[in-house]
């Protein structure tokens, strides 16, 4: 079931380095929110904090609150592994398990959770591959290695793997940056379909992509080298691209910097 995300006064640190300052925003359920901004502005750092993936970096910590339907994902006793099951991640480059079969790639998470029923695994594999618009392309070779698929197919396989464990939120960190234009269009169409069932947050450097797929857009910027990234503004995507409130947003979207 898609859930709402709320960030309140979020500050992110890596050791003594203050990476992101004072972020507050809300992501409605069944909505695509795009994070845009120049390199180093903190958008991917914020994205990774939404399911505690940034914690794999030593010294990382978050101050403030990140709430999933009102529950603080950094609260006492909250298991990061459980958070990452509820809030899935699709990375910049397709990362299927290359020697594992297509089917086993999809159900790897379920197997880690102890699922052993072949019927259940088969059902989830088909449902997830259909959900990722990949089923018709791979249904006759489910036992073949996932690494043998094209780049675009591999990324859709990774999306199928992410949705197989029934998350509430999907995070996508530049999911099309390594893909050709045709594969990119397929992923964008898929994102539009997936938002019927999931809350989606996507980081992208592609302004046209943000305008095409997102319902709201958040613009992040960096004041200066060594300073933390900040959220400049967030609004409906149409307004951000046609009539932004902040001059920095307009300058970035129009290509004056970034």
From Swiss-Prot:
Part of the ABC transporter complex PstSACB involved in phosphate import. Responsible for energy coupling to the transport system. The complex is composed of two ATP-binding proteins (PstB), two transmembrane proteins (PstC and PstA) and a solute-binding protein (PstS). Residues 5-247 form the ABC transporter domain. ATP binds at residues 37-44. It is an enzyme of class 7 (translocase). It is found in: Cell membrane. This is Phosphate import ATP-binding protein PstB. GO terms for cellular component: plasma membrane. Keywords: ATP-binding, Cell membrane, Membrane, Nucleotide-binding, Phosphate transport, Translocase, Transport. The keyword Phosphoprotein does not apply. PROSITE patterns: ABC_TRANSPORTER_1, ABC_TRANSPORTER_2, PSTB. Belongs to the ABC transporter superfamily. Phosphate importer (TC 3.A.1.7) family. GO terms for biological process: phosphate ion transmembrane transport. It is a peripheral membrane protein. It comes from Rhodococcus jostii (strain RHA1). One of its GO terms (molecular function) is ATP binding. Its main location: membrane. It catalyses: phosphate(out) + ATP + H2O = ADP + 2 phosphate(in) + H(+). Its EC number is 7.3.2.1.
């Amino acid at each position: 079931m898609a859930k709402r995300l709320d960030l309140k006064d979020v500050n992110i640190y890596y050791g003594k380095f203050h990476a992101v300052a004072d972020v507050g925003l809300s992501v409605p359920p069944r909505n695509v929110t795009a994070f845009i901004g120049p390199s180093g502005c903190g958008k991917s750092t914020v994205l990774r904090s939404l399911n505690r993936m940034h914690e794999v970096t030593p010294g990382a910590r978050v101050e403030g609150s990140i709430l999933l339907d009102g529950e603080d994902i950094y609260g006492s006793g909250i298991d990061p592994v459980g958070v990452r099951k509820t809030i899935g991640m699709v990375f910049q480059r397709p990362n299927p398990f290359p020697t594992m079969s297509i089917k086993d790639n999809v159900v790897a998470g379920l197997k880690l959770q102890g699922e052993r029923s072949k019927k259940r695994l088969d059902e989830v594999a088909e449902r997830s591959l259909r959900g990722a618009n990949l089923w018709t392309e791979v249904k006759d070779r489910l036992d073949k290695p996932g690494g043998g698929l094209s780049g675009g197919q591999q990324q859709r396989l990774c999306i199928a793997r992410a949705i197989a464990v029934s998350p509430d939120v999907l995070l996508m960190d530049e999911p099309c940056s390594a893909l050709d234009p045709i594969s990119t269009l397929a992923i964008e169409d898929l994102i539009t379909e997936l938002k019927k069932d999931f809350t989606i947050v996507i980081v992208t450097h592609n302004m046209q992509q943000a305008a095409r797929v997102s319902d709201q857009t958040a613009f992040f910027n960096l004041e200066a080298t060594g300073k933390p990234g900040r959220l400049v503004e967030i609004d409906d995507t149409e307004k951000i691209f046609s009539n932004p409130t902040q001059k920095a947003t307009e300058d970035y979207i129009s290509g004056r910097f970034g």
